[in-house]
Each structure stands twice: as C-alpha cells, then as structure tokens.
Amino acid sequence: MKGKHHIIVESARLKYEFDIKRNITIIQGDSATGKTTLIDLLSDYQNGRENSPVHIESDVPCEVFAGAGDRWRAVLELITDSIVFIDEENHFIRQKEFAEVVRNSTNYFVLITREALPVLPYSIHEIYGIRTSGKYHFPEKIYHEFYPIYGDTLRSQ
C-alpha cells in the first residue's frame, strides 16, 4: 500500500479527521486526550458495521487489532492492504519481531503509545498528538485533529 489516506471517524458527538502518509504513524499524548476513544470508536464500527452509530470514511479498510495473545503475528499476517490501529496495551509493538512483520506487510500501522519504539523505523514527522476543539456539552460535536509533535522547525535545519 502506498500514498496518503484520508480518514474520518465520526459518531453523533465526536469526529476525528486525519491523514495517514506512511507505513508507521505514532499517536502520543497524555491520558484523556482521545487516543483510546479513537480506538473504541473504530472497534465499535468494526464489531457492528451495519448497525454501528460510528461512521468511517476511508479509501482502504481500517482494522483495530485487539488481543490475540501470543498469536499476534499470525493474526496480523491475515490482514492485508489495510490501516491497522494498535493500542499500547499490546506489548509486542516493542519487539523486533513486530518490526519485521511491519517491514514485510502491505498494511499501514497506527500505533497508540506514550513510549518510544526504538525497534521501529518511523519518521519523526509521523508522530502526532490529538488536539480537541469544541464544547463538551451535548449538542455540539467535539472535533479532534492530529497535530505533529515535531514541527517544521526540524525540517528547516
């Protein structure tokens, strides 16, 4: 899979809109910034596509990887040409074996983590946080966007 993919994940009260440009994208941030909420919305959609209150717009499938224990490699190898979202609770993302799976995969990976992942070859320009705008009372939608952790100051050096 190559190129940029525009993703919109939306429910009645929340909206995430972002672009995935490389095979590894990292989303970082403190607690309560919306990282796990994004995974939860994607999971809700994945588990009940027709009846889900979550709407996803994407030119490629979006999959949430959820617990396969020691079989994580076999499960990931079944997914092809998709954007795979993996939360930090999956500790295998810190292993060299995972880096090998990513390198040989046709998927893009979005990794939600607070820690550095030194075994993975990702670009500093693909490390994002989640910025929230909007009100937290009912009728108004809360809009989430990704922002780069390392900005243009590094590009000009």
Language-model region placement:
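Conserved P-loop NTPase "ATPase switch" module shared by AAA+ and STAND
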Residues: 67-96
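Post-Walker A helix-loop "phosphate-sensing" segment adjacent to the P-loop in P-loop NTPases
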Residues: 44-55
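The conserved Walker
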Residues: 31
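Sensor-1/coupling segment of RecA-like P-loop NTPase cores
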Residues: 102-131
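A short helix-turn-beta junction within AAA+ P-loop NTPase domains corresponding to the substrate/partner-engaging
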Residues: 121-147
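N-terminal pre-Walker A segment at the start of P-loop NTPase domains
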Residues: 1-16, 137-153
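Post-Walker A alpha-helix
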Residues: 38-40
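Conserved lysine of the Walker
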Residues: 35
